[in-house]
C-alpha cells in the first residue's frame, strides 16, 4: 500500500484541484508528489503514474544505479521532482525555477532543463547551509543568492526549501519573481504583504522493503509532570457517550515494547496491549486530486473492560488489554452507537479526543468509587470544563501543548523509519485556513481513480512537557532526534482582524448562554444520552467543518455534567436520532443587530473560503485595489477633459485677437504707404516745364487697353515723346515711387511753362513692385488722366473725397495716384473729377466701397486722337 505524506515537492501546497490535481508517483520507494502544473504533466493517466526519475530507473539495469546517477546538477541531492537536462543529467524543477538563468526547453512539459546560460560563478559559490551541516556538499551544484541587495550569502535552492527560506514576490499579479532570503533577512519577507513565504518542505524518504517490513519501537516512561491547568487548542471536542465505563473508547496504556507490523487483514485481531488510535487521527489533511485519492482505512473500535483497571500501569492503573478489529470504516462504540465521522482530522483533534476520552473514563471510574488519584495525574471530570472553552490567541500550537497533560515522556529507540513516521505524523498541519474540497468531490474522485489505502503503521505519540520553560527532554539521542523532527511544525496564523472578531463573538455567545437558565428536555420517551454543548456561530455541520478548517471554531464553556448525565447547556439527542434543538437554537439566535451582521459576515466568508478554488481574501484585496485605481483614473480623465475644454476656449479667443491684429496691421501699412508717397512727391522738388511736345514715336505705336463698354472719346492715349527735358535736379524723383505716378507728375505743367518738349519715357517704365519690371496694365484712372491740365485743375477737396470713397477696394497703385492728386492743391480741374466719377458706371472702372475690382478686359490697340 502507498503512504502519501506531504504536499507538492515544488510549491509545498497540500491541496489539489480539479484542473490542477496533486499526483503521487507510483515508483518504488519514491515519495514524489507534484501538481500537474508544477511538474508539466501534459495528461493525467488513469492508471499508475511515474515521475521522470522512476521512468528512467525502470529502464536501467539494477546494478547500474548509484547515488550519483540521479543527483541534481544544481544541488547535492538526488530526491524530489527531477527533470532531464540538456547535459544528459538531472535537475530539480524547484532549482530550475529559483535560479533565474535556468530555463526550460519546453515550457509546457518543463523539460529539458537548459543550463547553458548559468554563469560559472554560481557554480563556484559556497552554500552556507551545507557549510554548517555538510561541508563536503557546500561547493556542489549552483547556488542562489539572498534577495537582500547588501547580503552576500548564497545557498542551494533545496537547502533553502528545507529551511523555509524560499519566497514569491508579486504573488497577487501574474509576474511572479522567485527569490529567497537567508535566515537573517527572512524577517523582511515575513513582514512584507507582497511577499509570499513558501513553507518549509522537508524531504521524506522511505526505507527499503526489507527495513520497512517489521520494526520495533521501545518506549520507556519517565516521571510524570504535574497536569497543566489549561490546554490551548483549536479543535472541536468529539461527542462521546459516558453511560458506563465499558462504553468508554480509547483508554490506552503504556507498554515497554511495541511491534509495528503491517496492518492485519479484515477480521483479524491484534493483541498488543498498546493504545492504537484510529488511523485518521494521524492522517495529514491531504486534499485528494482528480487522479490520486486516499481510501480511508477502517478505524478499529477499541474497547476496555472495567475489570482490567488496576493500579499497576504507569499511565493508567492497569495495562488494558485491547482488542482492535478492522470491521467498520466508522468508529463503533460498545453499545452499538457510532461516532460522527470527521472530514478532516488533525493532530490537535486527536489529542483533544484522547483527552475527552480519558476524562470521561475518569468520570466513570469516579462513579464506581474509584478515586481520581488512581488515574495517575489525569484530570477528573470536574476539571474538564477548563479544557473545553479556552480559545487561544493564536492557532500556533506546539506538540507539547497538544498532547494530554500528565502524559509520560518516552525515549524513542529504534531505526530511522520510526523517526520518519513520527515526523510525518507530527508535521501534519494543525488547522487549515485554506480552502478544501468537500467530501462529495472526494468520493467522486475515489470512484474514478485507483484507490489507495492509507497503510500508515500505528504509533504512540510521546508527549513533551508543556510547562512554562518548554519542558524537559529526554537525554537519549533518539529523543533529541525526535525533538528536532517535530520542531519545524508549520501552523498557519489567523490574522489580527479575525482574532478580534473571534474574541468578540465568543464573549457575546457566552453572555447569551449564561442568560439561558432553563434546561432543555427531550420530547421522546426513549432514553437520552447527553453530549457537551458546543455553541458555534454555524449551526449546520458544513459551516462547523469550515470553521474548524479555518481555525475559528468557537466553544462555549462546557459544564461538569458528565457525572450527572444532564446539563442546562447540553444539547439533547434522543435514541431515534432526532435532536431537540429548541435550547441550542435559542443559544444561537443573535441578541443584537451587530451579532446578526457578524454572523452573516462569518457565514458568507466561510462559505466562500471553503468552496472557492482561489484565495478569496487575496481576490477581494485585488478588487479593492482595482476599484481604487479605477476611481483615480476617472478623476484623472475628468481633469484632462476640463483642461481640454479650457484650451479650446483659449484657442478661440486667441484666434479672434489675431484676426483683429491682422486687419489693424493692414490698415497701418496702407497709411504708412500713403505717408511715404506724400513725402516723396513733395511739389517743391518738381521743376515746372514749359510745354509738353507731342511727337510720334520711332517704334510701333503704344497700345493702351480700353474698357469694352465705353467710348474712346473719354480717354486719350498717353504717348512717349523722344524729346528730352531739362531739370535743375534730375535725381529728385526716387525709384521707390511707382513709375506711372512719376510719369503723370512729369506731365504736369503750368500756364507759364516754356514750350520745350519733355521726354517722360512712360512706356518703358510703367511697372509695379509686384510685376518686377513688366509693363503695368492700364487702369481707369491712368486712361482717364490724359491731360496734365485736367489733373492739375482737380481741387484737393474733391481728390480727398474720391480717395476716401474708393480706398478699400483700390489697388495700391491707384491709391498712390489719388494720394498724389490730393497733394497738388489747385492743380486738378473740375472736368477731370467729373470724368473720374463717371467711370464707376463702366465695366472695369472704379467700384463702390466694400466691393473688389473686377478684372480688366484684354488690352486693345488705340490710335492717337491728335489731342
Curated annotation (Swiss-Prot):
Residues 267-311, 440-477, 503-586, 753-773 are annotated as: Disordered. It is found in: Nucleus; Chromosome. Residues 69-186 are annotated as: Extended PHD2 domain (ePHD2). Isoform a: Expressed at high levels in maturing oocytes, but at low levels in the rest of the germ line (at protein level). Isoform a: Not expressed in the pharynx, germ line and tail. Isoform c: Not expressed in the germ line (at protein level). Isoform c: Uniformly expressed. GO terms for cellular component: chromatin; chromosome; condensed chromosome; histone methyltransferase complex; MOZ/MORF histone acetyltransferase complex; nucleus. Residues 503-512 have a biased composition (Basic and acidic residues). A zinc finger (PHD-type) spans 5-57, 125-186. The keyword Nucleotidyltransferase does not apply. Pfam families: PHD_2, zf-HC5HC2H_2. The record marks 4 as: Required for binding to histone H3 methylated at 'Lys-4' in vitro. GO terms for biological process: chromatin organization; regulation of transcription by RNA polymerase II; regulatory ncRNA-mediated post-transcriptional gene silencing. Disruption phenotype: RNAi-mediated knockdown results in developmental defects such as slow growth, protruding vulva, and a reduced brood size. RNAi-mediated knockdown results in germ line defects, resulting in no embryos or impaired oogenesis. RNAi-mediated knockdown suppresses the multivulval phenotype of the lin-15A-lin15B n765 mutant. RNAi-mediated knockdown shortens the lifespan of daf-2 e1370 mutants. A zinc finger (C2HC pre-PHD-type) spans 69-102. One of its GO terms (molecular function) is methylated histone binding. It comes from the Eukaryota. Residues 285-311, 516-527, 551-573, 758-771 have a biased composition (Polar residues). Residues 538-550, 574-585 have a biased composition (Low complexity). CDD domains: CC_AF10 (cd20901), ePHD_AF10_like (cd15672), PHD_AF10_AF17 (cd15574). Keywords: Chromatin regulator, Chromosome, DNA-binding, Metal-binding, Nucleus, Repeat, Transcription, Transcription regulation, Zinc, Zinc-finger. PROSITE patterns: EPHD (PS51805), ZF_PHD_1 (PS01359), ZF_PHD_2 (PS50016). The PHD-type zinc finger 1 most likely mediates nuclear localization. Recruits the histone methyltransferase dot-1.1 to chromatin to methylate 'Lys-79' of histone H3 and activate transcription. Recognizes and binds histone H3 methylated at 'Lys-4' (H3K4me) at the promoters of target genes. During stress, the zfp-1-dot-1.1 complex also plays a role in the deubiquitination of histone H2B sites, which negatively modulates the RNA polymerase II-induced transcription of highly expressed genes. In response to stress, binds to the pdk-1 promoter to negatively regulate pdk-1 expression, which negatively modulates daf-16/FOXO-mediated gene expression. PANTHER family: PHD FINGER PROTEINS (PTHR13793), ZINC FINGER PROTEIN ZFP-1 (PTHR13793:SF155). Multimer; in vitro. Interacts (via C-terminus) with dot-1.1 to form a heterodimer known as the zfp-1-dot-1.1 complex or DotCom complex. This is Zinc finger protein zfp-1. It comes from Caenorhabditis elegans.
